[in-house]
């Protein structure tokens, strides 16, 4: 029986979530599988991969062929390296302790790279948030200054119209007695 290590799709439309499974090569994409090896979530950044390393290496030893994406996932988690190092142990080129030391060193280096990427992404996100907040504060300050200027202009215009109205009332008051005098002279 030909066995493949491949992805089995789960999740909903537009939000894929995959199981990494060992399945018969003739079975359907989402059909029966022999063993679930792990999960792969491409929706997160960086993608989340959980893998049972020993189970994956066991299937590789038994001759399972990974698909292209599954091969990339196995390589990312170190399953292919462990399979390669186990081959060296079987041939006598390495001892098991040396192989384990190489694998743990590689896994630690890989974890450091992944953590650095996560830190970089969180720092970039925080910087973008701070920059957006600064831009929003500048816009708010401009808006407040424009509102204060408009209010001051409105007050100045109101006081100018008030002064003009008082001047008109004063002129009207001066004209009214003059008009009354004119009326008295015309009656006489």
From Swiss-Prot:
| Residue stretches of biased makeup (Acidic residues) | 164-188
State which residue ranges cross the membrane.
Answer: none
One cellular component (GO) term of this entry: cytoplasm
Q: Which domain of life is it from?
A: Bacteria
Q: Which UniProt keywords apply?
A: Ribonucleoprotein, Ribosomal protein
**Xref: HAMAP family:** Ribosomal_bS16
* Protein name according to UniProt: Small ribosomal subunit protein bS16
Traced from the root, the source organism's taxonomic lineage reads: Bacteria, Pseudomonadati, Bacteroidota, Flavobacteriia, Flavobacteriales
Q: Which gene encodes it?
A: rpsP
């Amino acid at each position: 029986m030909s066995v493949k290590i491949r992805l089995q799709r789960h999740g909903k439309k537009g939000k894929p979530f995959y199981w990494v499974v060992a399945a018969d090569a003739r079975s359907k994409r989402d059909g029966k599988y022999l063993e679930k090896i792990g999960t792969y979530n491409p929706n997160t950044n960086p993608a989340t991969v959980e893998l049972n390393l020993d189970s994956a290496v066991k299937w590789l030893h038994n001759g399972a062929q990974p698909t292209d994406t599954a091969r990339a996932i196995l390589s990312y988690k170190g399953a292919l390296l462990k399979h390669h190092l186990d081959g060296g142990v079987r041939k006598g080129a390495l001892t098991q302790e040396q192989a384990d030391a190489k694998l743990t060193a590689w896994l630690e280096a890989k974890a450091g790279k992944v953590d650095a990427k996560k830190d970089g992404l969180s720092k970039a996100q925080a910087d973008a948030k701070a920059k957006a907040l600064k831009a929003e504060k500048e816009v708010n300050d401009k808006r407040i200054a424009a509102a204060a200027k408009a209010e001051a202009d409105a007050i100045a215009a109101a006081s100018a119209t008030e002064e003009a109205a008082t001047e008109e009332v004063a002129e009207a008051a001066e004209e009214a007695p003059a008009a009354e005098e004119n009326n008295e002279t015309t009656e006489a």
